[in-house]
């Protein structure tokens, strides 16, 4: 076994759900992989930490997307590895119907945060993070079109549109 194989990977989970904005799923993956490639070529082997990126959903069923692409989750919330970082992609159009149907993801976010995960919400994906209560008392942002609704739904969040 080489030293590279012995190094624990940085565990990154990206939540996937219906109506997510596909670019807020794919762009972070591309940027993370580019950073990983740069780090691998510019660090000593024993200093390099590989990334393990998993698409996490409430079930393993394919998730259709308005682009015509289906998203295949790697694991369910109940089997997902402990995450160092969780990315919550933006939601296409009105986030409220999506948030209301994703209580298992909201619960998982809260549990993961309690276990030490860092969480990044992208645009309207912050509605899921706020629904978990993780933004209460903290500054946050969302898509400008939903800012007023966000303020009404999550009055404890310091919205910075």
State the predicted function of each range.
Residues 1-119, 128-131:
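Extended, subdomain-level signal for the structured scaffold at the beginning of enzyme domains
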Residues 135-161:
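A conserved active-site-flanking secondary-structure segment within enzyme catalytic domains
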């Amino acid at each position: 076994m080489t030293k590279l194989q012995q190094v624990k990977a940085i565990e990154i989970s990206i939540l996937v759900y219906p109506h997510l904005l596909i670019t807020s799923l794919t762009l972070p993956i591309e940027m993370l992989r580019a950073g990983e490639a740069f780090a691998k070529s510019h660090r000593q082997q024993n200093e390099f930490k590989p990334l393990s990126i998993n698409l996490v959903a409430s079930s393993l069923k394919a998730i259709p997307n308005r682009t015509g692409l289906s998203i295949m989750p790697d694991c369910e919330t109940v089997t997902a590895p402990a995450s160092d970082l969780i990315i919550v992609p933006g939601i296409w159009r009105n986030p409220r119907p999506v948030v209301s149907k994703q209580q298992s993801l909201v619960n998982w976010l809260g549990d993961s945060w309690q276990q030490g995960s860092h969480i990044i919400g992208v645009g309207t994906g912050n509605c899921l993070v706020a629904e978990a209560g993780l933004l209460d008392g903290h500054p946050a942002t969302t898509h400008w079109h939903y800012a007023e609704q966000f303020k009404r739904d999550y009055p404890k969040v310091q919205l910075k549109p």
